[in-house]
From Swiss-Prot:
Family per record: Belongs to the NAD kinase family.
GO cellular component, one term: cytoplasm
One Pfam family this sequence matches: NAD_kinase
Organism superkingdom: Bacteria
Residues bound to NAD(+): D84, G85, K89, N157, E158, D187, T198, A199, Y200, S201, L202, S203, A222
GO biological process: NAD metabolic process; NADP biosynthetic process
GO function term, MF aspect, one: NAD binding
Keywords: ATP-binding, Cytoplasm, Kinase, NAD, NADP, Nucleotide-binding, Transferase
Cited function: Involved in the regulation of the intracellular balance of NAD and NADP, and is a key enzyme in the biosynthesis of NADP. Catalyzes specifically the phosphorylation on 2'-hydroxyl of the adenosine moiety of NAD to yield NADP.
Protein name: NAD kinase
EC number(s) from the headed UniProt entry: 2.7.1.23
Gene source species: Bacteroides thetaiotaomicron (strain ATCC 29148 / DSM 2079 / JCM 5827 / CCUG 10774 / NCTC 10582 / VPI-5482 / E50)
Chief place of localization: cytoplasm
Length: 302
């Protein structure tokens, strides 16, 4: 695991804030966040959807300097306040900008958004002092042979191919760098980064992969054969998928955003040519987070 050096930032920073719009009670943490940032003299920008949710729906007074429209914005750091889903949406908006993203967890599990509301004050003191780390997380790219996707073709967590409009399984012919691997008879197939290995991939039996492992996990969803198991490959290898379905279509989900493809569509999945920068507290250790979130060693008898 690489040793990450602290990043020294200027005293006055510009923060771009993204949040979810369906947790009214937990949105009170946003007020504390604004208070901390203004105390540091920071410039606050906010996505318009979150701003309207706080001001129009919750009647909050929000001290913002500018509203963000679309994906055309600049900032020293992006703050995602919500769960991992909110973090993924923020990462999609950041795209290739290489702006580091800090996740404040007001959701449930939170592997990406792992700073608790109780840790906000000390975390921003550390950021002000330059005592934090930035981790580079790999991204997957999806290419279709016959169409352009309506959503972004990039995934920080995973790309999933799933059945649609039928209870019958789909058939997914899978090749790695042109070499035939297997034809999966299953409800779907999940292609995950190390970051995504603790998300959907884990729930369907995929392996937990340490960040910076430079790998991709391929895990079937409810396979027909008990002999089929997940496989981990290098992330500089290319995956090609050809799908057959009784409904003649299938679903592609990219970090939770989905759309329908025809079974004539061939999918190519490869590592993207950019990464997402994730802000972590300087004393952050992945294994501590893993042990805590997965409750390893917890004894319910006590």
């Amino acid at each position: 695991m690489p040793i990450l050096q602290p990043k020294l930032m200027k005293q006055l920073m510009k923060f771009a804030i993204f949040g979810n719009t369906y947790q009214p009670k937990k949105s009170l943490h946003a007020l504390r966040l604004f208070e901390l940032l203004k105390k540091q003299g920071a410039e606050i920008c906010m996505c318009r959807e979150f701003y309207q949710f706080l001001t129009a729906d919750l009647k909050m007074e929000v001290p913002v300097d500018a509203l963000l429209e679309g994906n055309d914005f600049t900032a020293d750091m992006v703050i995602s306040i919500g769960g991992d889903g909110t973090f993924l949406k923020a990462a999609r908006r950041v795209g290739r900008k290489q702006i580091p993203i800090l996740g404040i967890n007001t959701g449930r599990l939170g592997f990406l958004a792992d700073v608790s509301p109780e840790e906000m004050e000390v975390t921003f003191e550390e950021i002000q002092a330059g005592r934090y780390s930035v981790e580079e997380r790999s991204v997957l790219q999806l290419i279709c042979n016959d169409r352009n996707l309506q959503e972004s073709p990039y995934a920080l967590n995973e790309i999933a191919v799933l059945k649609r409009d039928s209870s019958s399984m789909i058939s997914i012919r899978t090749a790695i760098n042109g070499a035939y691997l297997n034809t999966y008879q299953a409800d779907g197939l999940v292609i995950a980064t190390p970051t995504g290995s603790t998300a959907y991939s884990l729930s369907v039996g995929g392996p937990i992969i340490v960040p910076h492992s430079n790998t991709i996990a391929i895990t079937p969803v409810a396979p027909h054969s008990l002999n089929v198991r997940p496989i981990v490959i290098r992330d500089d290898w290319e995956i090609t998928l050809d799908v057959e379905s009784r409904s003649h279509n299938f679903l592609v989900a990219i970090d939770g955003s989905s759309e329908t493809c025809k079974e004539t569509t061939q999918l190519t999945i490869r590592r993207a040519d950019y990464s997402i920068k994730v802000v972590k507290r300087f004393n952050h250790i992945f294994f501590d987070t893993l042990r805590s979130k997965m409750m390893w060693g917890a004894d319910g008898r006590r």
